[in-house]
């Protein structure tokens, strides 16, 4: 285990009631339909929750997923928090890239897609 820890890996969040591995679309950075490469946001979420003490006191496992386009290859719609890159057009014709954030999705005993938290979230937020 020391050797594994020495290269930055851990088994701490592998099971139990914690934030699981933050996941993202397998085509991130290469998808022709991608609005944003979600890799940096997925990595930031991963780093925030990795070994975070709050993560060990959750009532159930907690899953976070990012997708770079509306195709949702990452299946963000079926996770506790799903973030899908989106774009909106302003009145002046300019296009702003950001996200649609979804919550409370799941594939358990009663599968259900996530609910939209808000219509659009700017990427700076």
Please report, for each region that a protein language model flagged, where it lies by residue.
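Small-residue-enriched alpha-helical segments and adjacent helix-cap loops
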Residues: 1-96
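FAD-binding subdomain of flavoenzyme oxidoreductases
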Residues: 76, 97-105, 113-116
């Amino acid at each position: 285990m020391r050797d594994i820890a020495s290269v930055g890996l851990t088994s701490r969040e592998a099971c139990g009631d914690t934030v699981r591995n933050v996941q993202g679309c397998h085509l991130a950075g290469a998808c022709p339909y991608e609005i944003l490469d979600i890799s940096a946001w997925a990595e930031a979420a991963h780093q925030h929750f990795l070994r975070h003490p709050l993560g060990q006191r959750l009532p159930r496992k907690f899953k976070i997923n990012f997708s770079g386009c509306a195709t949702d290859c990452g299946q963000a719609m079926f996770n506790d928090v799903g973030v899908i890159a989106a774009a909106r057009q302003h009145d002046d014709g300019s296009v702003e890239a950001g996200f649609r954030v979804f919550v409370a999705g799941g594939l358990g005993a009663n599968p259900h897609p996530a609910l939209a938290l808000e219509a659009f979230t700017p990427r700076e937020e």
